[in-house]
């Protein structure tokens, strides 16, 4: 029996397999887990059409298996960035492209939901790839923030990233 791989490329070795090389493979897996949990990569996208984010089984360096992704390049039409159907993960994705066109993040197949940056939106989104259904998986944007809670007698951290409170608060 041979190794299997997760949707993000982590090798799942079978007992007794890879005699003499399991240490190297385990170290690669640990590096891959580190990349998945907090890595950063700049991913060039195609000017038009689709840009797939692929996994590289048993290797580091794949944009798909990186937590923070900055999309780069000049786009000359609306584009999509897609991921394989078996991926469940969350990402911080920045639209660092130039060109006034939309960027849509979606699964490669299926009819589930997706997340789209408008033609003028060059911001960062927190995106959850649910992988909840093999035919209609959802990709959703996680909205963080909102109006601050509390009163003017409490210290508040608001959605602009500033602290607020009453002038007489001591």
Model-found features: residue ranges?
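Short, surface-exposed terminal/edge motifs of secreted or surface/virion proteins that either
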Residues: 30-39, 99-108, 113, 126-146, ...
């Amino acid at each position: 029996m041979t190794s299997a791989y997760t949707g993000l490329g982590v090798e799942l070795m079978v007992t007794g397999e890879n005699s003499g090389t399991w240490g190297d493979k385990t170290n690669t897996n640990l590096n891959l887990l580190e990349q998945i949990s907090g890595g950063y990569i700049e991913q060039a996208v195609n000017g038009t059409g689709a840009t797939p984010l692929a996994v590289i089984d048993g290797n580091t360096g794949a944009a798909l298996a990186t937590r923070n992704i900055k999309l780069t390049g000049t786009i000359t039409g609306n584009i999509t960035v897609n991921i394989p159907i078996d991926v469940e993960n969350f990402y911080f994705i920045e639209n660092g492209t130039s060109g006034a066109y939309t960027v849509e993040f979606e699964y490669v197949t299926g009819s589930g939901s997706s997340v789209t940056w408008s033609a003028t939106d060059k911001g960062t989104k927190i995106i959850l790839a649910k992988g909840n259904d093999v035919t209609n998986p959802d990709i959703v944007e996680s909205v963080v923030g909102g109006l601050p809670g509390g009163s003017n007698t409490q210290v508040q951290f608001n959605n602009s990233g500033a602290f607020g409170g009453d002038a007489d608060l001591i």
